[in-house]
């Protein structure tokens, strides 16, 4: 489960870091049978997020071991409000990958939305910074997983252009159905390029709903 989803979030806020209660989520996850938490770095840089300090990383490791959890993914929401086309943002990703490697993280999730929205028209612009980030991740044995609004065919084109073995795809069931994509067709097309899955459901108004009550089949 994604970090922050086991704590009551502020009104209207779905993706957030539970600043005052982040440690408790690890024990809650263990108690309800969840075996791992996907860590997040926020849309605005937060120096108090434990991912940014060695002391914080030690705390995370201790909590994971104490609660018998796994730890293999980190999502960098920072690029949602800060364009990856900016050199400083690319460097933020590289710094975060180095921190993630200290935790043994295997997957680095990059959500290409809003300020970093990646489309068929602009994908050439993103190749250089994306390759730069992915090459750093490769050094640390980390796969970079791209979450985008692209269709399956457009994603295949992007992966061919990037042409790096550690660049893969995030398949988010809710987002895919919200954009009218062919879920089954895309899954068959992307096949082994799907490295990470976010399972959620959405209704016709693009609202998150309980699994099984929306448009995802």
Task: List each language-model region with its residue ranges.
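Hydrophobic faces of well-ordered beta-strands that scaffold small-molecule active sites
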Residues: 1-4, 10-11, 37-39, 71-76, ...
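N-terminal pre-domain/capping segments
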Residues: 1-101
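Active-site-proximal loop/turn and secondary-structure-junction residues that shape catalytic pockets
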Residues: 3-7, 41-43, 77-80, 112-116, ...
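Charged helix-capping and loop-helix junction motifs
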Residues: 20, 52-58, 86-94, 122-131, ...
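Active-site acidic/histidine proton-transfer and metal-coordination neighborhood
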Residues: 24, 63-67, 81-169
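Structured loop/turn residues at beta-strand edges in well-structured enzyme cores
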Residues: 32, 69, 103, 165, ...
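Glycine/Thr-rich phosphate-binding loops of Rossmann-like dinucleotide-binding domains
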Residues: 47, 118, 207
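Acidic/histidine-rich catalytic cores of soluble enzymes
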Residues: 74, 128-215
């Amino acid at each position: 489960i994604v970090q922050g989803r086991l704590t009551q979030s502020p009104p209207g806020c779905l993706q957030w870091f539970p600043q005052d209660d982040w440690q408790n989520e690890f024990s809650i996850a263990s108690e309800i049978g969840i075996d791992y938490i996907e860590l997040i770095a926020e849309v605005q840089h937060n120096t108090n997020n434990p991912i940014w300090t060695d002391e914080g990383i030690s705390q995370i490791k201790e909590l994971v071991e104490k609660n018998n959890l796994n730890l293999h993914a980190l999502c960098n929401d920072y690029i949602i409000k800060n364009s990856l086309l900016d050199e400083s943002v690319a460097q933020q990703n590289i710094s975060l990958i180095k921190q993630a490697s200290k935790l043994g993280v295997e997957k680095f999730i990059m959500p290409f939305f809003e300020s970093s929205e990646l489309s068929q028209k602009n994908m050439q612009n993103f190749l250089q910074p994306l390759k730069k980030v992915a090459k750093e991740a490769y050094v640390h044995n980390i796969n970079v997983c791209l979450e985008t609004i692209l269709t399956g065919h457009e994603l295949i084109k992007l992966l061919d252009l990037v042409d790096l073995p550690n660049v893969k795809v995030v398949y988010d069931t809710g987002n895919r159905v919200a954009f009218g994509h062919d879920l089954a067709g895309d899954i068959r097309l992307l096949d082994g390029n799907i490295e990470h899955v976010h399972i959620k459901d959405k209704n016709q108004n693009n609202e998150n709903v309980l699994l099984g009550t929306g448009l995802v089949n």
